[in-house]
């Protein structure tokens, strides 16, 4: 198993835990969706896995195992990539995509002609037209969907074993949501990469995930295969989320 989270509890400052005893796992080539409303603790869990909790946040119980060993910041940074809600917000508006991308690659030891080939190939893989033109563009010259696909391409560049995605489609229109979701699923299948995606959208989770974890008030209220959670939910909260999606299995098809 690539990642195992066992009985995880997280607190901010000296307050009571905001996440209580959450457990889940995800293996290579699989997608786990963590779903819940704002304040449910789903993003906090993702940050703990990625070792990017805010300074006042701390894991107060449980274990995070990566490749069977206690998770360490150095290992996670080397083998994990992040996709945020708006990848464009992470890009410098006065620098071209090519400049940003090449500096990112250089930080991971990829330079020169190898970097040029890598950037072009990755932008092509996420189906961006005219990769050479994209590399010469500034972030504000691209649509939200195109910026997000650039973010996915950059996330793929270091051949991560795990991608952590926090609401990667919530700022996009329906058409661009579908494109970005399919690109993430392609990455998972093509590179045997594990993905954990945080979302409030049950329809999105049901479409792309192999496994779903439902969170409410810092607790895991339901966890299992996507089919089991979608078609045979046990918790009333899960049923409430599903009631808002008439045909979750048909979304984006």
Sequence positions of predicted segments:
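The feature captures the beta-strand-to-loop junction immediately N-terminal to the Walker
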Residues: 35-37
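Q-loop/switch helix immediately C-terminal to the Walker
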Residues: 86, 95-106
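Conserved ABC ATPase signature
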Residues: 137-142, 146
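A short, surface-exposed alpha-helical micro-motif characterized by mixed small hydrophobic
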Residues: 205-207
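ABC ATPase "signature
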Residues: 220-224
């Amino acid at each position: 198993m690539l990642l195992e989270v066992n009985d995880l509890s997280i607190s901010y400052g000296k307050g009571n835990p905001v996440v209580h005893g959450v457990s889940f796992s995800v293996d290579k080539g699989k997608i786990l969706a963590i779903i819940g409303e704002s304040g449910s603790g789903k993003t906090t869990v993702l940050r703990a896995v990625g070792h990017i909790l805010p300074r006042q946040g701390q894991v107060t119980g449980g274990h995070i195992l990566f490749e069977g060993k206690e998770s360490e910041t150095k290992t996670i940074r080397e083998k994990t990539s992040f996709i945020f809600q708006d990848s464009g917000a992470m890009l410098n508006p006065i620098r071209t995509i090519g400049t940003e991308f090449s500096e990112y690659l250089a930080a991971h030891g990829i330079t020169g002609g190898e970097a040029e080939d890598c950037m072009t190939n990755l932008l092509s893989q996420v189906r961006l037209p005219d990769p050479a033109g994209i590399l010469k563009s500034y972030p504000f010259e691209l649509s939200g969907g195109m910026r997000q696909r650039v973010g996915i391409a950059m996330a793929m560049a270091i051949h991560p074993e795990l991608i952590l995605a926090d609401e990667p489609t919530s700022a996009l229109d329906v058409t661009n949501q579908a494109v970005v979701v399919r690109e993430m699923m392609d990455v998972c299948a093509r590179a045997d990469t594990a993905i954990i995606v945080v979302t409030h959208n049950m329809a999105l989770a049901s479409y792309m995930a192999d496994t779903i974890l439902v969170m409410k008030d810092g607790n895991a209220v339901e966890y299992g295969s996507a089919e089991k959670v979608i078609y045979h939910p046990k918790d009333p909260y899960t049923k409430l989320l599903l009631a808002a999606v008439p045909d979750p299995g048909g979304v984006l098809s």
